[in-house]
A protein has these predicted regions:
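Acidic, glycine/proline-rich low-complexity segments that act as flexible tails and inter-domain linkers
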Residues: 1-70, 110
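A short alpha-helix capping/helix-coil boundary motif
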Residues: 6, 21-22, 55-60, 83-84, ...
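Short, small-residue-enriched loops and turns at beta-alpha junctions
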Residues: 12, 29-33, 67-71, 96-97, ...
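Buried hydrophobic packing segments
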Residues: 29, 42, 78-85, 103-106
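Glycine-rich anion-binding loops and their surrounding alpha/beta cores
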Residues: 51, 74, 86, 109-225
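Glycine/serine-rich anion-binding loops at beta->alpha junctions
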Residues: 59-99
Length: 225
């Protein structure tokens, strides 16, 4: 499956697929899903088609919220706290996928979120943390092309969500990752059982990629902040 994923992702990055073909790919993922081994292969294919960052010191920490909860601004609080503790957290975020605004859109209200991989590393090593749009650099470049199809469809396939998050973290050099999974009516993960399954998948995928993952299942039935 790894070789097939390489060809699929290479076609996406090189823009060899029409919007109709790419839509069919995303819908197929939504309907059929993938097991963890297939998701790990997809994730590594996404990493290898873009740039990667290596830091001179570690460990490298990161944080991600699955999203789907209105008003979620947790990242804007977590990153400064981690950086203030003397740790490195090179945080990249996406624009909106299934909501009105993604983390990168929110940060952009206050500051420029565009930086390349070299600048991300430089800033993270200098001040400890970054708040950047992942689409402005070539970390897992297939992801942003796929997101452009997911947004109008209003879907975020389980396997693609896992691969999207973990490919960006792997490419950014993360060793330790915390995943926030907002749960409840109106979120991407409506039940505690689904949240627990999501957490297991993230941790299993992290183990295959060499990233230590811890998950927090949080209440998401009301706006955050």
């Amino acid at each position: 499956y790894y070789v097939r994923s390489q060809f699929n992702i290479a076609d996406i990055v090189q823009h060899n697929l029409s919007n109709i073909e790419l839509t069919a790919y995303v819908v197929a993922l939504e309907i059929n899903g993938m097991n963890i081994r297939e998701t790990a292969d997809l994730t590594m294919a996404m990493v290898e088609t873009g740039d990667t960052i290596t830091f001179d010191r570690g460990p490298i920490f990161d944080f991600h919220s699955v999203g789907g909860c209105p008003g979620n601004k947790i990242t804007l609080i977590v990153v400064p706290i981690v950086a203030a503790a003397g740790l490195i957290i090179p945080k990249t975020s996406s624009r909106a996928i299934s909501s009105a605004a993604g983390t990168a859109d929110i940060i952009e209200v206050f500051a420029d979120v565009n930086m390349d991989a070299h600048k991300l590393r430089t800033v993270a090593e200098k001040v400890g943390g970054t708040l950047a749009w992942g689409g402005s650099m070539s970390l897992s470049p297939a992801d942003d092309t796929i997101i452009k199809v997911e947004y109008p469809l209003g879907i975020d396939p389980h396997a693609q969500l896992l691969a999207s998050v973990m490919s960006k973290k792997k490419a950014a050099g993360a060793n330790c990752l915390v995943i926030d999974i907002p749960t409840g009516a109106g979120t991407k993960v409506p039940t505690i059982e689904e949240a627990q399954a999501f957490a297991r998948d993230f941790m299993d995928l992290g183990e295959k990629l060499g990233i230590e993952v811890r998950c927090a299942i949080t209440y998401g039935e009301q706006p955050v902040g």
